[in-house]
Amino acid sequence: MNFVVPDFYPATAEIFVAVMALVIMLATTFARSVARGLAYGLTLVTLIGAAIITYNTANPRAVTTFSNMFIGDLLGDVLKLLIYFSMAVALLYGRSYLADRKLDKPEYYVLALLMTLGMMVMVTSNHLLSMYIGLELMSLSLYALVAFDRDSARGTEAAMKYFVLGALASGLLLYGMSMLYGATGTLEISGIAKSVYNQAANDTVLLFGLVFLMAGICFKLGVVPFHMWIPDVYHGANTAVTLIIATAPKLAAFAMAVRLLVWGLFDVAEHWQTMLMFVAVLSIVLGNLAAIAQTNLKRMLAYSGISHMGFMLLGLLSGVVDGDPHYALDAYSAAMFYAISYVIMSLASFGMIILLSRAGFEAENIDDFKGLNKRSPWFAAMMMFVMFSMAGIPFFIGFFAKLAVLQAVVAAGYIWVAVVAVLMSVIGAFYYLRLVKVMYFDEPADATPIQAPAELRVFLSANGLAIAAIGLAPQGVMTLCTFVLLASTQP
């Protein structure tokens, strides 16, 4: 038996993050007096270093290593860069919030890095086993982060719900993967694609496996009918953790959906498209209608996120029409653009909640934003940009994300789906505009001046301005998405 030494070069960033997570654990153990600041600083250095390594090791052509378990392509590289950026911004936004509550412990940052490593493995997986390992590493880190505040009964309850439902979803996903292996005889995603294309797979077992696979993907995206955990976890976790849950994992879940469904099961698209269609429509309808009744902003954004993920799925399901992949590139590019847009908007929305929160006070109710324009006209404008963008009002990034997806849906011939999506967007605009009305036309319930670190103010301002700026010139990001997906094909 010959042992082939794998090529470590494409996976340098993953190895670097894993090593740095161990270094931070050891360093903070022996430097207790400066452990909190040291862990935070080293974590940001790690994310910046990983970004530099990923950029320098990027390959325009797809390469595989570790017995084809790891794939290095532009899709993985770009999503990893976005994950680093999202995690760095989330940690920066949350630092003062955590410090006020004595939660900025080294373990928090180690868990954040391990979660990042899990997402990196997910987006670069060409094998069902490595995909599952990355998913579990991300999930277990998230469970611990949700329960990180041991004095919060609400957080502990949310973590328990998240863990139980997450374990169930992981079991369903693993069962689906085992059935795919039974149907195709391989665990490699590229091998599964070849087996399905050559009609060498057992169709009955394959379709059963696809159903369980879809259940796992839908849970990680937080869409109907696997959405039950989203509102409770968003509400129960402290806002710094909610910010993390609502952003980077969505990019990893998008990558998982693309790798498994588009790359691996493209030739049975007519089956998973039908499932995705009903899931997406139900998510858009339920998400928007449920959000209207919410008075807690975190729960409102949770239901809003369910709706947004439904929109993203519309892009994925519109790629193939009657076996013709003519519009596939445009549709999948629209879905990727939507995922990126949602992450940018979520960073700003939860960042604003953190900005208005202080020790002993959580600004998570809609009434807490009353009269914000009188307290801070600048940040009221930033929050207005976020709400307008999420509502899909021209000319913000959210408008063009929805427009791109709707164009793909119409091109695929799903006119009734587009009509429902537009109608729900109009209805959903109510709860976004309600917050704008509260900020500009109600009297402030709290006249306390906004106190926040300079870096939070600067980055949050840049975040809000980016939502408007990309909305004015979205073509650059759309072109990037198209180029990345065009260059990222199975080797």
From Swiss-Prot:
Record membrane topology:
Multi-pass membrane protein
Q: Quote a single Gene Ontology cellular component term.
A: plasma membrane
Q: What is the protein's major site of localization?
A: membrane
InterPro entries to which the protein is assigned, alphabetical: NADH-Q_OxRdtase_suN/2 (IPR010096), ND/Mrp_TM (IPR001750)
GO aspect biological process, one term: ATP synthesis coupled electron transport
Q: What is its EC number?
A: 7.1.1.-
Indicate where this protein resides in the cell. Answer: Cell inner membrane
* Keywords noted in UniProt: Cell inner membrane, Cell membrane, Membrane, NAD, Quinone, Translocase, Transmembrane, Transmembrane helix, Transport, Ubiquinone
Q: Which Pfam families match?
A: Proton_antipo_M
Q: Name one GO molecular function term.
A: NADH:ubiquinone reductase (non-electrogenic) activity
Residues crossing the lipid bilayer are: 11-31, 38-58, 74-94, 106-126, 128-148, 163-183, 206-226, 243-263, 272-292, 301-321, 336-356, 379-399, 410-430, 465-485
Q: List the catalysed reactions.
A: a quinone + NADH + 5 H(+)(in) = a quinol + NAD(+) + 4 H(+)(out)
Q: Of which family is this protein a member?
A: Belongs to the complex I subunit 2 family.
Matches recorded under PANTHER family: NADH DEHYDROGENASE (PTHR22773)
Q: Which HAMAP family match?
A: NDH1_NuoN_1
Q: Relate the assembly described in the record.
A: NDH-1 is composed of 14 different subunits. Subunits NuoA, H, J, K, L, M, N constitute the membrane sector of the complex.
Q: What does this protein do?
A: NDH-1 shuttles electrons from NADH, via FMN and iron-sulfur (Fe-S) centers, to quinones in the respiratory chain. The immediate electron acceptor for the enzyme in this species is believed to be ubiquinone. Couples the redox reaction to proton translocation (for every two electrons transferred, four hydrogen ions are translocated across the cytoplasmic membrane), and thus conserves the redox energy in a proton gradient.
Q: Give the protein name, as stated in the record.
A: NADH-quinone oxidoreductase subunit N
**Provenance organism:** Azoarcus sp. (strain BH72)
The organism that produces this protein has a lineage beginning with: Bacteria, Pseudomonadati, Pseudomonadota, Betaproteobacteria, Rhodocyclales
Q: Which gene is this protein's source? A: nuoN
